[in-house]
Amino acid sequence: MNRLLRWILLVALPFALLMGGVAWVDPFNYFDGPSPVPLETRRANLRHSGATMPHYTLTWKLIEFRRAPVADIIIGDSRLTRFDAALVSSITGRALYNFGVPGGNTPSMLRTFWYADSLARLETVYLQTGFRNWSAAQDYDIWEGPAWAAASAVHYLTDRDVLGKAWLDARAHWGSVQAEGIADDQWATVIGNERAVLEQYAPAPHFAAELRRVAARCRERGIRLVIIDLPVHDEVHRMEEELGLGAGIAAYKELMRSTAAYCDFSGPSAITADRAQYIDALHTSKALLEGVIREIWQGP
């Protein structure tokens, strides 16, 4: 019996140490307590690489929002990375939570709505999206892993990706790990990726049905639903035209207009022509984004 107990303890010890290490570092601030790694470092490492950004960012935000839910949220993709929620709050006098996730797609955005709706008495929901997000080719999963890890302390402490993030945070704090920067060929890379996305475009009626279900819930609960289409550079619009996507874009915009209040800044327009106002063809400069924010929340 004693030998069996010792064997069990020896087998369990490495797992206990791993779980203890994860709890100590607390890579996604689940326990919201002291950690040897500063909060700023753990938050910065959400953007460590393009491969991990979707999972890491969504995990962090699911945990953070559950701890302190608010009534107004904006849900979207990487184009909300530089979105200044504090600027919106300074205009409206209301807290706004930014649920923007790099790599976010329509399924994850709509599931985020239901998650937030389960935790808060929502009053205003802004959905930042774009034509590219409404293709059936964009129906991939980034939700399940983060949602599982955020669901309980046991899940959190035993999740492989949480362990990986804890190791990353430790190396960033005590070592010399550096986050990926913006590559010199960022523009060309984004354009190439966007062409591949647009070439695979196919209507996604199940996305439309789920959006209508969200809109129905908003009407039922008295939630104001606003859809925001941020600017993209005209090089994207030229590709859309070249690929014959005009009818698909028109149908997409009609769906948005018929479902909720629709703020369409996507272009083509004067603000989508100036390359200097863009980090790459899909992502605006902070200055241009702040101008759009002021137009939406303050009016012309």
Please name every model-derived segment.
Residues 70-71, 94, 121-124, 219-226, ...:
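Loop/turn elements at helix/coil->beta-strand transitions in domains of secreted/extracellular proteins
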Residues 215-242:
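Active-site segments of SGNH/GDSL-like serine hydrolases
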Residues 110, 204-212, 243-253:
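Well-ordered, non-membrane alpha-helical segments in soluble/globular domains
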